[in-house]
Amino acid sequence: MRKKQTLILALLTVFTSLCHAQTTRFAMTLSTDLGLAGKNYKIVTPNVSATYDLTPKLSVGARVEDAITLAKIQGVKTYDYLATLGGQVSYDAFRILTMINVQPRLIVGHTIGGGHDRGYMYCQGGIYLKADRKNGVMSEIGFGIRHNNYRGDLYKDKTSFFVSYGFVLR
């Protein structure tokens, strides 16, 4: 499983780097999301995404994340470490102070491997704020809601609020 994660990350990095030499319509984002759903469930998802601007405001992309889940089930503390692969759509809705883009974003993904009981599909929607620049490194922050729909009976489906911080390389 670790080789699969490394391979996907390497392919996304190479793909984004090669395309960056041709145009700035491609971007790569490195970020971490922290999901909070009460004291018995937390999820941390370091992730990387490669996006392509279809129009000046609309972009689509692929996303890979390492989902680290910390849970307390019937008094027993457990953790899970799974990789997910998904896609995202975002739209630059408007600007604040002519230098900050407000961007609603929808992300959908599924776990890679991990067995039947541990796997899940997730849907995440949020509002992200980032600098309105065409090139260089920009920081972004975001917040929203994430829902994990587990396939097995090991975990119950969870909805959590999340905050995100990352860097956009364009």
Spans of features found by a protein language model:
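Gram-negative outer-membrane beta-barrel domains
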Residues: G113-R170
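Solvent-exposed loop/turn segments connecting transmembrane beta-strands
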Residues: D33-T45, I73-Y79, H110-M121, Y150-K158
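Cleavable N-terminal export/targeting peptides
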Residues: M1-R25, R170
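Short glycine/proline- and aromatic-enriched beta-strand/turn motifs that initiate or cap beta-hairpins
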Residues: H20-I68, S164-R170
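Small-residue packing motifs within transmembrane alpha-helices
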Residues: T6-L9, K57, F162
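Outer-membrane beta-barrel pore domains and translocons
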Residues: S31-A37, E65-T69, R105-G113, G142-N148, ...
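Gram-negative (and chloroplast) outer-membrane scaffold detector with strong preference
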Residues: S49-V137
